[in-house]
Amino acid sequence: MRTLTRPSAVLLSLLLPLAAPAGAAADRVEAPANGARCDEALPPRARATLPDPFLRPDGARVASRSEWACQRRILRATAEAHVYGARGPEPERVEARIDGDAITVRVGQGGREVEFGARLRLPEGPGPHPAMIVVGGVAGVDDALLEAEGVARIDFDATQVGAETGTTRERRGAFFELHDGAMDGTGTLMAWAWGVSRLVDAIAAHRDLLRADAVAVTGCSRWGKGALAAGAFDERVALTIPIESGAGGVPAWRLLGEGAQPPASAFGEQPWLGEGFAAHLQEIGSLPIDQHGVLGLVAPRGLLVLDNPHVDWLGAPAGHASALAAAEIWRALGAEGNLGYHGAVADGSHCAWRDEWTAPARDAIRRHLKGEAAADLPLVAAPGSAADLAPLRDWEAPALR
């Protein structure tokens, strides 16, 4: 890959009403005629099986595709209230600068200003290029594949916006500084997702280099948790590829089995999750949304889950179950081929790229970033890690009209 060698950098200030903010598409949708409130979170309800992602707060179910946009906002509000913490308002001002391989983003809100950076690697050939944001700046989708497909790589050290402070759960980083204590109940996964959204703003400000309509996000392990949150909470992300994300990422909380990281451990290890999650630690079945519902926030866009069945701590069987349940959402929206899960790999090394993943990742890139014909994304689990969805739910996907 190459770096930008222009003699002068680009500096643009984005007035966010002109640059589509995160979730903008959903915000333009009117509430259904039945009067459902699209900003209302689902209430806690104890249940051992996976919650119905089509169930509204009033007890009715989504009946049409046009109602899904409102339901997505309900699920989003529920995920904020019970899992991640509040995302907060969109910033008043974003400035983005690219100088060589350095991206600098400056964000202003309420008289305060913060700055963070990322590293850009461009593929050979003329732009504008699709872009893959790598949360954490390590691992992620194979470099050789990105180069071959003409995709730029943006390495993002997400701890700049949300620091990992261990068991103290102290909130530090640009996201928390910008909001001056108002978001201290929010977890760092949401802060990382916010940082990815600001990089999408930066991409939108440099359309001669990068394509704002062809942005992907990836990351492995804890960064995979952040990649999923980024894709779930920003509809401008065309393709999300969480890798070996473990508890707090793809796997369903209710289904984490023996050897997998328990919810209380994930909550206490780092301030990844919002403080609202603590209310469910004694009874995880009281969560009104599980991670299949978070995956559903990505629908009908591209989502490819890459998993590792050789490390019990990652909870691959619960990840496969979560993907199967989420696939019902894509199916109801008529977009089955846009969701994939691949966990059938021979190598158990954590965060190593596997040859088995190259073909589905290539198809995902071609399908969702390049607009090319490509195979539907697979749903493939390793023997011994495959889930049977039937006993894990008491709902069926509706036939949305």
Task: Place the predicted regions along the sequence by residue.
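Bacterial N-terminal signal peptides
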Residues: S8-A19
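Bacterial Sec-dependent signal peptides at the C-terminal "C-region" and cleavage site
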Residues: L18-D27
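Alpha/beta-hydrolase-fold serine-hydrolase catalytic core, especially in secreted/extracellular enzymes
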Residues: A26-G117, L122-G127, A148, E235, ...
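Alpha/beta-hydrolase fold active-site loops
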Residues: H129-A131
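Cap/lid segment of the alpha/beta-hydrolase catalytic domain
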Residues: V134-A212, G246-L255
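Extended catalytic-interface subdomain
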Residues: A191, G195-L199, V217-C220, P242, ...
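Primarily recognizes the serine-hydrolase "nucleophile elbow" in alpha/beta-hydrolase
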Residues: R198-G259, G268, L273
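Mobile cap/lid helix-loop segments that gate and shape the active-site cleft of serine hydrolases
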Residues: P242-V294, G315-A323, I329-E336
